[in-house]
Structures are given as C-alpha cells and as structure tokens.
Amino acid sequence: DWSQTWTYFDGEWREGNLPLWGVRTHSIWLGSSVFDGARAFEGVAPDLDLHCARVNASAKTMFLKPTVTVEQWIGLVREGMARFPENTTLYIRPMYCAERPGPQALPPDPESTRWCLTLYDAPMRKPEGFSITLSPFKRPTLDTAPVDAKAGCLYPNNARAMFEAKARGFDNCIVCDFLGNVAELANSNVFMAKDGVVITPIPNGTFLNGITRQRVIKLLRADGIAVVESTLRYRDFENADEIFATGNASKVLPVTRIDERSLQPGPLYRRARELYWAYAHG
C-alpha cells in the first residue's frame, strides 16, 4: 500500500496514487519528465524556494515549458502540508511532463507541458550509517545526457548502480565519471574528511550539484571548517577518516563501511548534521 499521498493536478487536490498520464503521453513513452524533491520535517521545509526554482530550470533544459512560478509552487506546498497531521515527514515532488510529441515524435511539444505537485508521507532514514562500494557503472557527461537537469531519464543509470551494489551486499555505491574520478553516490552527493578537512568532488558536469550539498558546504565554511572541492579518486575515500552523504532523502548521513573497512560517524559528519538541522529550524 502507498503511504498517505496528496497531489495537486488540474486545479484540485486529490488523494492517493493517481493515474494522471495516458499510454501516449510523451514523458511516459520517451522520458521527458523532470521533477524535484524537497523535504518537510519537524514542521520545516528548508530551501523549498531553491527546489522549486530548480524544477523550473530543469523543465527548460528538457525543452518543456514551466508555467508555475516559484511563489506559486511554494504556496501549493504549504496547502499540501496542511492536509497531513502536524510534523509529518514529507517528500515534496513538483513535476513537469510533456503530453504530446513534437516534430518527428522524438522531442516533446513544449506547449503540451503539464504539471503536478505530489506530497507524501516518507520518513527519513535514521542516521545509523550505511555501507558503500565502487560501482562498475559510470556517470554520463553533458554531451551524452542532460545531467544539468533533474530529469527522470537519468535515474535508470543510478538504479542499476544501486541494484548491482545491493547484489554484492552493500547499501549504496560510489559512481565515477568516465575518467575514473569520483562523482557521487547512486542517490546522493558524497563527502570525505581527512586530517580535519572536509573534501568533496568538484562539480564537473557529470552530476547534479545538490541543493543540500551546497547548503552543507556553506554552513561548514561559515563555522570555520575547511571545505575543499577537488578531483578525487576512489582510493581517497578508501583512506578517508570519515565519509558522509548529503541529499534530499535523509539530508546528512554517515557512511560506516567502505568495502570491508569499518568507519565510525566522525566529528565533522556530526557537525555537518547539527549545522544543517539548526539551519533548517532557523
């Protein structure tokens, strides 16, 4: 069964997992959908404006026509949150899809763009840590895929990386670019710490520069902690003092095992999580 879900579509709120698209809908057929993911937890929804702005930017990248302003998205999110019990932990997903194909079927027709906003009950993972390994799959580049958008068509690559890692007994995996440089985890951005310095892969056009990632970097630097964006290899993570992840699923989480090496949640991870929670409630 689906958790409690509310969706705003065609001018009204509807409950449940709604069948909104048809068998000829372009985004279902040829993958032209975009979305974003924000969070509401403990009564707050940090950086909601940035998530709403990003879904509109993603739509333009994918040749869709965004028709909802950031302010309208935010207002609808607040309406949707009010439909749940107070302090319910929610996943917030604005989405654009193309209904019809454009010339020669392959591109979408921008004028057929439709949108919806879905909120659903989705508890965040407890900060108990998770295991990672190295994925054999690679991140695409900007000249091979629309990696500058949060597009649904990108996620099967992440999914196969996750499936492969789980088949080997790991929770997640580091995915590299075609040059062998670390890009991200299968579903989140990744950080490491060495000798008191936080280090994270520099955005190089192969992965999404996450909103939570950017926020954590700003918070750590404002707290006087050195954060370096750099080109990293897998061996750097194998030798790290700490590894942690940022993303919308659970915000800031520690990695407690890389391959067969155990790690403990360290002071820099803990500080990053503390700072983020303080910011969210500020």
Each language-model region and where it sits:
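Helix-start/capping segments and mature chain N-termini
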Residues: 1-79, 97, 103-282
